[in-house]
Amino acid sequence: MDKIILNGGIVMANIYTSAEQLVGKTPLLELTHIEKALNLEAKIFAKLEYYNPAGSVKDRVAKAMIESAEKSGQLKEGSVIIEPTSGNTGIGLASVATAKGYKIIIVMPETMSVERRKLIKAYGAELVLSDGTKGMKGAIAKAEELAKEIPNSFIAGQFVNPENPKAHFETTGPEIFED
């Protein structure tokens, strides 16, 4: 995050230089209409994760998996990120990976919506479609095949990566208590 001083000495604070800097710190909204409608004494809150840059809670997971891989040395300059997905994690990974300068290949079943495909491509990812009749198992197999063929590649592994749930333990949960 930078501060910019404009002509006349006006200071613009909170200027971000990359989309991944905007992940997290999403607002909480009290759902008063539901509380009233159900005559509840308890309070109900919603964490508005659509405020994340790529529009979902999966942005947190994407950022955590990429940053953990960078710290461990699995991911470095010139690496290619590969991920099998059916949607939001792939969108989040495409957003964060592109912002950090990585090439990313998203593998998804051909049965996924055209809108998801367009969004993934709009974030700068290469999209590889797998056989829709094989579901996510087919997408995982295709991603593993690509990883064997592409040097310096890294599968983020949302389904098995402990950074996925850890992201919420370290960010989402504490944010709820801080708000």
What residue ranges belong to the model's regions?
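PLP-dependent amino-acid enzyme catalytic core
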Residues: 4-179
